[in-house]
């Protein structure tokens, strides 16, 4: 079975990463490649690393150009996907890498994004409890945010196992600059970023906060309160998340580790490292893998989980392709058998 796929937003980092993965997918033929502001340009001018697709000409992002494909990936700015998605045929599998369809609560969407809620689609993080079944046969899929991907992978086993308290969760995550997109910004130029780290969205203002609370709350079966602080790190790609939560009385270090082992032992892309080994962003660069370590701080009664992912791969495009594979009944790992890059 050969699947025809269209990719919108192909001039950006997320769209380019989707194309990189699809170019190596055994079951996919790449059809329309669109980028509204760069229509008419050669893809190779904007994504010079995509050698096999370099001669392709970018088309305008219209419903007409995207229709007629089995799958459409939307790698568009937040708020831009909903209108296009609503006009695509119901039988088309539409995978939205933007935020438009992630949140279940319309009030949370309106508070953090400032527009009308477009509805909720199945959430494309297969490793969450019960999520694979929801993705099978789905024709609309919301790709998680990059920070929520790492945060939810880090803490979901503890909340799903009723081991953690819901009211004191603290998450600090460092991301590479590609997470801020490709548009030129003064704070992202080399002389500002090199040798420096800086927080942003501090004090509960980051848009991924409600998404993290939603996912952890679904796992816990009750509301979870999260303090989330993102940090910009001097690297092009990668996320290193440190997530902590108070454990419930009587929970032991052995119980914690057992919960994470049980959650991820059979997962092809999520790996709990041997005790004493800690995650690094370099070890997952360019891959769809997530690596993590869990520890118990007996002094404070907190679990500490560190998780490393590539924000563009597992955090965006890899998760999108993985979800597509599940939705279409393909091998879940198809097109994703990539190891990290070293040194």
From Swiss-Prot:
Q: Where in the cell is it found?
A: Cytoplasm
| Keyword annotations from UniProtKB, A to Z | Amino-acid biosynthesis, Arginine biosynthesis, Cytoplasm, NADP, Oxidoreductase
User: Which CDD domains does UniProt cross-reference here?
Assistant: AGPR_1_actinobacAGPR_like (cd24148), AGPR_1_C (cd23934)
| InterPro entries found in the cross-reference section | AGPR_AS, AGPR_type-1, NAD(P)-bd_dom_sf, NAGSA_dehydrogenase, Semialdehyde_DH_NAD-bd
Upper classification of the organism = Bacteria, Bacillati, Actinomycetota, Actinomycetes, Micrococcales
**A GO term (biological process) for this protein?**
L-arginine biosynthetic process
Pathway annotation from the record: Amino-acid biosynthesis; L-arginine biosynthesis; N(2)-acetyl-L-ornithine from L-glutamate: step 3/4
Q: What class of enzyme is it?
A: oxidoreductase
Q: Which family does it belong to?
A: Belongs to the NAGSA dehydrogenase family. Type 1 subfamily.
Q: What is this protein called?
A: N-acetyl-gamma-glutamyl-phosphate reductase
GO molecular function annotation: N-acetyl-gamma-glutamyl-phosphate reductase activity; NAD binding; NADP+ binding
> What top-level branch of life does the organism fall under?
Bacteria
Catalytic activity, EC: 1.2.1.38
Query: What organism is recorded for this protein?
Result: Arthrobacter sp. (strain FB24)
Active site (catalytic residues) = 146
State the reactions this protein catalyses: N-acetyl-L-glutamate 5-semialdehyde + phosphate + NADP(+) = N-acetyl-L-glutamyl 5-phosphate + NADPH + H(+)
Q: Which gene encodes it?
A: argC
Gene Ontology CC entries for this record: cytoplasm
Q: Tell me which stretches of the chain form a coiled coil.
A: none
